[in-house]
Amino acid sequence: MPGRKFADGEVVRGRWPGSSLYYEVEILSHDSTSQLYTVKYKDGTELELKESDIKPLKSFKQRKSGSTSSSPSRRRSSRSRSRSRSRSPGRAPKGSRRSVSASYQADAKEKEMRREILQVKLTPLVLKPFANSVSVYNGEPEHMEKSATPPKNKQERVILSTEDSYIATQYSLRPRREEVKPKHRVRGTNLVTRGPVPLGTFQVTTPQRRDLEFGGVPGALLIMLGLPACVFLLLLQCAQKDPGLLQFPPPLPALRELWEARVCGVYLLWFFLQALFSLLPVGKVVEGTPLVDGRRLKYRLNGLYAFILTSAAVGTAVFWDIELYYLYTHFLQFALAAIVFSVVLSVYLYARSLKVPRDELSPASSGNAVYDFFIGRELNPRIGAFDLKFFCELRPGLIGWVVINLVMLLAEMKVQERSAPSLAMTLVNSFQLLYVVDALWFEEALLTTMDIIHDGFGFMLAFGDLVWVPFTYSLQAFYLVNHPQDLSWPLTSVIIALKLCGYVIFRCANSQKNAFRKNPTDPKLAHLKTIPTSTWKSLLVSGWWGFVRHPNYLGDLIMALAWSLPCGFNHILPYFYVIYFTALLIHREARDEHQCRRKYGLAWEKYCQRVPYRIFPYIY
């Protein structure tokens, strides 16, 4: 591996990305892996530069002292002065005159260079001053906001999605003579398109994160070991007659009882059947958010079609008396098969990520093998047109959740010898079915979430999508099989009203966000106010997003409480989902907060002042 050329603390000249201008910088550090230098400009800007973009100071001094050439106009011979003429005795010698002229021209050139430097306006991650710059989003600014600079293109005024954490460092440049031209990579595929790059901006590849989340490497190890144990603990506890906290769960069955080839075969059949459904040429094709290099990946949205085909297949199985009760009696075995499959998939994902270019890695990756195996190294792993992460996010786990709930409903009727499912089981199935259908109907919204645009695809998402979602989110239905609950109609009415309230908040907030992102000039949204940012995006500060910073999280939690209440109040186990989901969303909100503060700077501070509550009004 080549050694470094410049030492830490050395003062050199660094080329500003996208231009031919060099500025005085200080070497802060050197990454031996990426061969990039972290440098600091005089205005405090820190960037990572290649060694070829850094020059020692002496090279510039030599050029300055040795530059004695005249301007192009003076280098040309004038026809009127082509013949030699006599020199007056009072004139200085020719060589002295030439040196004075060269010195004068060098000084003039240096002044011109200084003027050129002064005309470059650096605004890295720092907002242009928006004095009270809260404006009506497609109307005239208020009287105190006249100084705010509006975006050049109205279509760029899209809503901030706090899940949308695509990190692009943008600088606003005004060179006099040089136009910054974005560079595009050439790819021979029709699955990728490039979005237009606004004039006056360019993107700098975001370096890999050094501040590790989830407790770093120790936290990642603890989570990877603890999650499978937690799944088995919950399922064993829920199957007991008394699932109280003071009751220890029965011991885990022997491995030879847990591992069944037939169960593994059924699970693999399920996974590949969903993969086949996702490859069907039905549903519209949309583009994702821009990647670091400007590309946009294409996604086929046919999740709802896959759900309909799955429902038809399950209905056919019920019609032909195929024993779905087998899933209930082998629930632990199916959980183990899913765990093993998620681990194998994670190993494959990590192995393939070692061969991909650096610009295809996740911004969350760190360079540590353990942490990257957990968080995921590759951002968008694909096999041809098949996007592994996008597929696993909704299809096998989310649709599998509905199938498991249906099996638990049939199991309740068989175990409790009912002719019809209980009211509590019906509410749980109906509420969660609505939640899944909503996610599949608005599948396009997934493309702007943190999971898709920021986190890589590793153990965290693979285990969460394939194991955690179907086997722990169905805990309420699993609980009701052996712990029946009788609900009164007044209580049922309250639960239904709570569910509808949560769903209205959840859906209206997400719909408002998506509508603003797609068409900021929609007259239906003319009443909304925004805070402009230096990235040409705007932060909604009214409507649902002026109520709390994450109204969709609030609605999500209300719905989670609503589908846990039918399980009664005898045990806390059915409320595990509410407790876990509250902790998850608070943690995710903190991640959103950190990234939005880095991306939007002072505009985010202003937004937080206008909307002080994060999720729960007047509480948090």
UniProtKB/Swiss-Prot annotation:
Phosphothreonine PTM sites in chain numbering: 123, 205
Comp. bias regions, Basic residues: 73-88
Gene field: Lbr
Name listed for the protein in its UniProt record: Delta(14)-sterol reductase LBR
Gene3D superfamilies cross-referenced by the UniProt entry: 1.20.120.1630, 2.30.30.140
EC number(s) given by UniProt: 1.3.1.70
PROSITE patterns named in the record: STEROL_REDUCT_1, STEROL_REDUCT_2
InterPro entries noted in UniProt: ERG24_DHCR-like, Lamin-B_rcpt_of_tudor, Sterol_reductase_CS, Tudor
Domain text: The Tudor domain may not recognize methylation marks, but rather bind unassembled free histone H3.
Enzyme class label: oxidoreductase
Transmembrane segments: 216-236, 263-283, 304-324, 331-351, 452-472, 486-506, 525-547, 566-586
Organism, scientific name: Rattus norvegicus (Rat)
